[in-house]
Every structure is written in structure tokens, then in C-alpha cells.
Amino acid sequence: MRKKLKEARQAAGLTQQKMADRLEISLRYYQQIEAGQRTGDFQIWDTLEDITGVHQRKLREIEATHPDRGANQ
């Protein structure tokens, strides 16, 4: 899960649906990005950075406990 992305979205006062609408993507696609299951393209991350005011490098971080992360990471 991208905890920083979720926190930034909530701090911006946006639901997942409202964020998806702002990004002009489906709710499911946004949910997969926030869950760390999809990466999204650079335009999405640029827009997320603009909306939240948080650098996209921080937003992209996936929690170490995410099941897709290896033990070495």
C-alpha cells in the first residue's frame, strides 16, 4: 500500500472517487495505484504531486509490508 499517497489524498480532503475524477481515470485504476498494485504513468504522478503538494517520490513509496515487495528491498 502507498500509505503516503493515501494520507496526502485524505489531507487534500478527497475521496478515492474524487481523486480519480481529478485524474480522469477510473475509480478502480486509482484504487490499484493507491494499493501499490499498478504504477500509473508519469502524467498521473505529476498531477498527483500538483494536487497534494507532496513530491511524487514520496507518494510512490510502497510500504515494506506490501506482499509484492521482496525481503531484500
What are the language-model segments listed below?
Residues 3, 42-45:
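Short alpha-helical elements of helix-turn-helix
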Residues 3-22:
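Short basic helix-loop element that most often maps to the first helix and adjoining turn
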Residues 5, 19-20, 30-33, 59:
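Conserved hydrophobic/aromatic packing and binding residues within compact polymer-binding modules
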Residues 11, 32, 39-43, 50, ...:
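Short, charged recognition helix plus adjacent turn
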Residues 24-25, 29, 36, 44:
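A subset of signal/propeptide-processing and intrinsically disordered low-complexity segments
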